[in-house]
């Protein structure tokens, strides 16, 4: 895809002005890093506040009296009981229980506000419309940008521009206003830090981003550091760590499936692939692989698609994401291994350029999460 065919976010001119190195991502021209570089951007986010352009992601509204029940029929997640103002992580599944996409949704009272991955948004929209378009109105929000402000000082900076955001706690959201622009802000993100995601009208996005960058705590952060931050936080990247061939149980996302949708729950099953997913949850269908955290015992980064073996040379899985964790200060990774080798502390070998690198199965996150829960 040439530059001329790449889509541009509302902040494209600002990225260029800031000296960003732009790369193709999910069909958009996106900043992978700014002149400060990935390491500096990563550390700044963990210490202060980083501003990310995530406008490539899909935003949509589901509207109508039946919207919650309809949306719940697509996911192994409790949508119906989600209180107004609360946000939840969700998983769209196919009929084999594979993950079509992971997403976030908020009950805003008069609608469900949904944020999906950029590379999946057109497919997700078609899937949602096909499955539940007759039960509720599905309205893409193409005219809005999306910013993420992440880090321990995010609240300090954002509160100056948007008073009242400090009242939000992790996984809640609310409507705010900035210079006449209607904002919808959730206290959430994908870095493991406290922070916010801000939906803003596209025609106000650049001015709002400039106002945030004028705050002393805030610096721009690109996709490179976004990736290292989310991996240290133990969070999946769709297309790398989860895809249509992985089930939520294989992906160790059991926590995302509430009790009410599980065997014995009041609304058990009733989602695509339920028979398989519930059998895996209940242990009646044994898993063949499981997502785990991994730490390299030598200072050698272990990248995606690296083969994992037992010390005896038997292939038992592969790495799906891996890099030298800037805050962890060691090579961290996640990947899939056979369940017999998934216990924390299990020693494995990653085969890097033909040589075995010793690794150990580790708990995640690799860096403690610092979400603000009130």
What are the language-model segments listed below?
Residues 1-26, 30-34, 107-374:
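Conserved, structured C-terminal
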Residues 1-90, 98, 223:
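Acidic, proline/glycine-enriched N-terminal capping motif
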Residues 65-99, 154-181:
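Internal amphipathic helical hairpin motif
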Residues 102-106:
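Conserved thiamine diphosphate
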